[in-house]
Amino acid sequence: MAHYDLLVIGTGPAGQKAAIQAAKLGKKVGIVERKRVVGGVCTNTGTIPSKSLREAALYLSGFHQRSLYGASYRVKQDITMEDLTFRANHVINREIEIIQNQMTRNNVDLWFGTASFIDPHRLRIERADDLVEHTADFVVIACGTVPARPSHIPFDDHSIIDTDGLFGAGSWLFDV
């Protein structure tokens, strides 16, 4: 069991900023991520992927170049979901790499697992192969969000999907 000045739960934008800033102020910091990858919803299924998909669609469809080359201009005639996700995945993976490098450069300890409180200053972290406990003077809970699924909207993960289902959508997306 190690003692930290700050433990952070969640590696999304809020957790990242809290951990990095505390480390830059000379504090001993640890951060816990429940998923197997850093970045939270923003990096993995939300903001960055959705904007990357949009930009890929605009580029491949030639939308921005049509004023120069005419209304029928396209970079690629038949655009597939694979074409769109290729660029999005590149951007996502680069962002994950940046986040991990920031943590390493600032000496922030990173664990992948599920954090739970034993008491106000002690966390249990259940990892894939073991359990560890750490104490901290302060704990920041930055556990993120999930897509809203209002009960009156019939999400079926085929015709109506949220951002969590988008990257698993496959080629059928263009048949809808």
Residue ranges and their predicted role:
Residues 1-14, 172-176:
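Beta1/beta-strand and adjacent pyrophosphate-binding region of the FAD-binding site
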Residues 2-4, 20-27, 33-173:
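Glycine-rich flavin
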Residues 9, 32-33:
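The conserved SAM/SAH-binding core of class I Rossmann-like methyltransferase domains
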Residues 17:
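Short alpha-helical segment within the catalytic ATP-binding CA
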